[in-house]
Amino acid sequence: MKILSVLLLALIICSIIDWSEGQFTQESCTASNQCWSICKRLHNTNRGKCMNKKCRCYS
């Protein structure tokens, strides 16, 4: 029963912490497709989206 509570606590902590590995850039944007080339150039991934007029890249 102790192990179950430890695993539950670890799951809660991991879900609270931002584990998405998203990285904000200083590049401004108006649409997510503008971020794809920026993310490819800066972080070697083409997965990105425009959030609050800034590109966010996901690895």
UniProtKB/Swiss-Prot annotation:
Cellular compartment(s): Secreted
Broad class of where this protein is predominantly found: secreted
One Pfam family matching this protein: Toxin_2
Site (Aromatic residue of the functional dyad): 58
Gene Ontology terms: cellular component: extracellular region
PROSITE patterns to which the protein is assigned, alphabetical: SCORP_SHORT_TOXIN (PS01138)
Role description: Blocks calcium-activated potassium channels (Kd=43 nM on KCa1.1/KCNMA1). Has a potent presynaptic facilitatory action, with less effect on direct muscle stimulation.
Name of protein: Potassium channel toxin alpha-KTx 1.2
